[in-house]
Amino acid sequence: MPLLNSVTTPYAEALLQVVNENLQTEEMVSEVKQLLELINDSPELEKALSSPILETDAKKKIIIEIFSNKVNSSLMNFLKLLADRQRIGILTSILERFLEIYRENSNIALATVTSAVELTDEQKGLITQKIINIAGTEKLELVTKIDPSLIGGFVASVGSKVIDASLASQIRKLGLSLSK
């Protein structure tokens, strides 16, 4: 992914610089997350934006039609710029890189917690505190996923650290120790 980062990083840094100058960072981070969610939920949109067949003007019309009421003017101008420079096809990578740089600059760790069932707010709070202690960071962004195959418990990952407190893992370990 280093080659893609060499393309996405300048755009992501430019967007971050614009929002920092306009003091819109938190608002922009929220909009970028919503935009990523919208694109990830719509494979047709992602195909259209990355299609080499569609002309730049057609892509800009799609952007204006879909995003004009959903994003602020700075982000809209950024999307149009990407279309003009024929980089709109890597929009998700640019936005993900923007969030990575934002987290790095703000000392925010990204943690993914996968559980067998939906976690309550109390459970999320407890897990967040444990992960903050382990990761040695002040702030944490928690992404939750559900995987019923875990049976119970959770698996949390922050960077290269993984905490496997799942029932499936414990059963697997028990099975391995019994087979010896």
UniProtKB/Swiss-Prot annotation:
Subcellular location(s) per record: Cellular thylakoid membrane
Keyword terms: ATP synthesis, CF(1), Hydrogen ion transport, Ion transport, Membrane, Thylakoid, Transport
Database matches in InterPro entries: ATP_synth_OSCP/delta_N_sf, ATPase_OSCP/dsu
Topology of the protein relative to the lipid bilayer: Peripheral membrane protein
Record flagged with keyword Ribosomal protein: no
One Gene Ontology term, aspect cellular component: proton-transporting ATP synthase complex
Cross-referenced Pfam families: OSCP
HAMAP family linked to this entry: ATP_synth_delta_bact
Subunit structure: F-type ATPases have 2 components, F(1) - the catalytic core - and F(0) - the membrane proton channel. F(1) has five subunits: alpha(3), beta(3), gamma(1), delta(1), epsilon(1). CF(0) has four main subunits: a(1), b(1), b'(1) and c(10-14). The alpha and beta chains form an alternating ring which encloses part of the gamma chain. F(1) is attached to F(0) by a central stalk formed by the gamma and epsilon chains, while a peripheral stalk is formed by the delta, b and b' chains.
Protein name (Swiss-Prot/TrEMBL): ATP synthase subunit delta
Annotated organism of origin: Prochlorococcus marinus (strain MIT 9215)
Gene behind this protein: atpH
